[in-house]
UniProtKB/Swiss-Prot annotation:
Provenance organism: Burkholderia mallei (strain ATCC 23344)
A single GO BP: protein transport by the Tat complex
Similarity comment: family membership: Belongs to the TatB family.
Any Pfam family the entry gives: TatA_B_E
Subcellular location: Cell inner membrane
Name recorded for this polypeptide: Sec-independent protein translocase protein TatB
Residue stretches of biased makeup (Basic residues): 160-175
Function: Part of the twin-arginine translocation (Tat) system that transports large folded proteins containing a characteristic twin-arginine motif in their signal peptide across membranes. Together with TatC, TatB is part of a receptor directly interacting with Tat signal peptides. TatB may form an oligomeric binding site that transiently accommodates folded Tat precursor proteins before their translocation.
Bilayer-crossing regions: 1-21
Keywords on record: Cell inner membrane, Cell membrane, Membrane, Protein transport, Translocation, Transmembrane, Transmembrane helix, Transport
Length: 175
């Protein structure tokens, strides 16, 4: 950076006054100040853009690292689940089949032998079609009452009067 002290600035001002003259010096100083301000704004914009790009690059790398870690965790979980499912199928097949060891050596999954059954396929029963009326009858009465559109609205005072015991009611007077 330039080392401009007060004495050097004064020397530059005197030289500019001599060269430009007192009439044009204020106009040139104003123009120089405007150009200097524009240059500073441009430099600040470039600095901000560079810092934003650096932050975005850091965020991108963090995002890729996070996604990679998530994929690794997901793969680990799936591998563990597959291993446990294989163990369960082997235990199930050894318990179901009379031989035991022959069924446990067979591969699992869709390529398995047609006689071999998975614990998952036996445990899940086929979905039965429910009757519409039975399904509607299952809805609780309190829920129907709470969600029903009210056709008769009663004020709070009328509700209190309706539930007040007869012994506490005032006698109704007409005229």
């Amino acid at each position: 950076m330039l080392d401009l002290g007060l004495s050097k600035m004064a020397l530059i001002g005197v030289v500019a006054l001599v060269v430009l003259g007192p009439e044009r010096l204020p106009r040139v100083a104003r123009t120089a100040g405007a150009l200097f301000g524009r240059a500073q704004r441009y430099i600040n914009d470039v600095k901000a853009e560079v810092s934003r790009e650096i932050e975005l690059d850091a965020l991108r790398t963090m995002k890729t690292d996070f996604e990679q870690a998530a994929r690794n965790v997901e793969n680990t979980i799936h591998d563990n689940l597959r291993e446990h499912e294989r163990d369960l199928n082997a235990a199930w097949n050894s318990a179901v089949s009379p031989g035991g060891s022959a069924a446990a050596d067979a591969p699992d999954g869709p390529s398995a032998a047609s006689g071999e059954l998975s614990w998952r396929t036996i445990a899940t029963a086929p979905a039965k079609r429910r009757n519409w009326r039975v399904k509607k009858a299952v809805t609780p009465v309190w829920y129907k009452r709470a969600t029903m559109r009210r056709t008769q609205v009663q004020s709070g005072a009328a509700r209190v009067a309706r539930h007040r015991p007869a012994s506490l009611r005032r006698p109704a007077r007409f005229l």
